[in-house]
A protein has these predicted regions:
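Peripheral, non-transmembrane regulatory/ligand-interaction domains of membrane transport proteins
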Residues: 1-158, 162-165, 169-176, 234, ...
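Hydrophobic alpha-helical transmembrane segments and their immediately adjacent juxtamembrane loops
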Residues: 168-264
Length: 264
């Protein structure tokens, strides 16, 4: 917000239509390619409200439709009309917060069942969106608190209550997005713990197999040596049977020992 002698210049960052369309899909998922925010600049004077934006915006369309239905409200001044724009801008966060909440619930459900790489990528993308939304909400909150507390002469005292109402909504949304950020961090830590636990289970199985096979490999290596004076070479076919039975006994004893120690 920047104040001049006869005007007030304000910049806010509403959500883009493209992002809202992606968020509004039935499955509440998108690929993260949609740009979340755009820029809306406004100049307020005593009798004039000028807005500048780079693409069509829902809040401007809603204001235009409102004035077509209630033309007399336009006489209340630019500060009242600008409050309507900000109110529509803040209300657009509702479906986004619902999308984030649904996405976090989905991730929390599946992260322990099947911690796949695709879930990890989606978590990172969602966390980036939450951080970006949080930064924008904090910025918008600072703008609105200045408009709501009577810092500028161009905002009439009777309109401040409307700005305070929009500010209260924005504060509530900021608290919700902060809670979502903490929840996303917890889910990410849960995913990493589940992945680590899964890796430990795999290593446990591989280590168990290696431990069982190790004495068998040792026996095969000993009896595979070509020394003429080895006693077992004189046993003929029984020497072969003895080696197999010894290997099997080592494997059974190893498995029994693991069960006794409750390692399996």
């Amino acid at each position: 917000v920047e104040e001049f002698p006869d005007s007030l210049f304000v910049i806010v960052n509403p959500l883009t239509r493209e992002f809202l369309q992606h968020v509004g899909k039935a499955n509440n998922r998108h690929n993260g390619s949609a740009r979340p925010f755009t820029q809306l600049s406004a100049v307020l004077t005593r009798n004039l409200l000028i807005t500048h934006h780079y693409e069509p915006m829902n809040c401007i369309d809603q204001l235009r439709a409102y004035l077509q239905r209630h033309g007399a409200q336009g006489d209340r001044g630019p500060d009242y009309l600008y409050h309507l724009i900000l109110d529509a801008t803040v209300d657009e966060y509702v479906p986004v917060l619902d999308y984030i909440d649904d996405s976090l619930d989905h991730l929390e459900t599946f992260v322990l069942q099947n911690p796949r790489q695709a879930l990890f990528q989606r978590m990172l993308r969602l966390k980036r969106e939450i951080i970006l939304l949080r930064k924008t909400l904090i910025y918008e909150r600072e703008v609105l608190v200045r408009l709501a507390r009577g810092e500028f002469d161009l905002v009439d005292e009777r309109e401040m209550v409307y700005y305070r109402n929009v500010y209260d909504h924005l504060v509530r949304f900021t608290e919700l997005i902060e809670s979502s950020r903490e929840m996303a961090a917890d889910i990410l830590q849960t995913y990493l713990a589940a992945t680590s636990n899964r890796l430990n289970q795999i290593m446990k199985v591989l280590t168990t197999i290696s431990t069982i096979v190790l004495p068998m490999t040792l026996i095969a290596g000993i009896y595979g040596m070509n020394f003429d004076e080895m006693p077992e070479r004189q046993w003929g076919a029984w020497g072969y049977v003895f080696a197999l039975v010894l290997m099997l006994a080592c494997g059974v004893l190893s498995v029994g020992f693991f069960y006794l120690k409750k390692w399996l």
